[in-house]
């Protein structure tokens, strides 16, 4: 199960992303949705999750400022924005992906599948069984 947090200052953006995530054939749990970066920051510091879907342009604190304020980042970031001029800066902040709004469902699926592949420790078919058998024989 992929555990995600959604942060966008526009309520309709967090709600629509939440709806899209629930309709996918991928096991995703939305742990929290925020429209206020300061409230989100408190949650982020106190909870563990896999991916933060983070808007860049927000009042009071933009997405880059939010990440800069964290001592450590133990989750992956997917930036969401209507402005493609931030793409290079997003990857400098170690984003795993960058999705333009409105978010395309196929791009979102590709993003989540790529994350699963990156974090998966699965071995090719047969290799795991071989290793288990070798361990049992010793």
Show which residues each predicted segment covers:
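CheY-like receiver
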Residues: 23, 37-43, 49-132
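Conserved sequence signature across two-component system core domains
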Residues: 7-8, 34, 52
